[in-house]
A protein has these predicted regions:
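C-terminal motif of bacterial Sec signal peptides marking the signal peptidase cleavage site
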Residues: 12-15
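Positively charged n-region of N-terminal signal peptides that target proteins for export
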Residues: 1-4
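Residue-level signal for mature regions of secreted extracellular proteins and peptides
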Residues: 9-10, 77
């Protein structure tokens, strides 16, 4: 019986394998991607921007025309506006081989990881993004307006991990924040690995494209 148990364990070790790879984000943002010059008076640009932005999926939180400050926000799918790298998980066991490839900013992903010393784990990974944007309307000249979009990003990651051996789920939620053109990393895992997220400039470009 003892020899049979050892043989079974040896077979499992030989047949079970897993590896998780992480590629850091590659997005690069041009320094001027959050600024737009409009050849119209400031009041005219402001007056046309309010209804135009209201038609989009952004929420207008605050309007202060005398100071030229408008605050709008976005909440939803992070993959549209930030880059959190790429994740690949390879699993091999008695059920066969599986490979999961997905963007780190993907809103939801279910996958598996295999830890040689702990066994197979099922993961449900969810990402959410909140972007708060300050739009500043500045008069450069009588018929020229400079509009600057400064964003504060808050990315939230919620992970539920379930060990196949005991089927007991554990959930953790972590948030990071960074500004336009910046980046931040989630806390490192037990292996010292941490996922990084960077802004791509797409949110600022999309907002500024609506201002004419």
């Amino acid at each position: 019986m003892r020899h049979l148990l050892i043989a079974t364990l040896s077979l499992c070790v030989a047949a079970c394998a897993g590896k998780v790879d992480y590629i850091r984000p590659t997005a690069q943002v041009a320094p001027s991607s959050n600024v737009r010059l409009v050849e119209r008076p400031r009041d005219a640009v402001w007056n046309s921007s309010v209804p135009e932005l209201g038609k989009q999926f952004f929420v207008i939180n605050n309007l202060d025309k005398p100071s030229g400050l408008m605050n709008i926000s976005y909440t939803g799918d992070p993959e549209r506006y930030i880059d959190c790298g790429k994740i690949t998980s390879y699993v091999k066991n008695a059920q066969g081989e599986r490979t999961y490839n997905f963007a780190g900013a993907k809103a939801q992903q279910s996958y598996e990881i295999m830890e040689p010393s702990a066994g197979l784990f099922f993961l449900d990974r969810r990402m959410n993004l909140e972007g708060r944007v300050n739009l500043i309307f500045e008069e450069v000249g009588p018929n020229t307006t400079r509009v600057t979009a400064n964003t504060r990003y808050v990315a939230t990651r919620t992970q539920t991990v379930r060990n196949v051996a005991n089927n007991f789920p554990q959930t953790s939620t972590e948030s990071i924040s960074f500004n336009s053109g910046g980046s931040a990393s989630f806390p490192a895992n037990s292996k010292g690995q941490s996922a990084e997220c960077v802004s791509t400039g797409a949110l600022e470009r999309e907002i500024l494209s609506a201002i004419k």
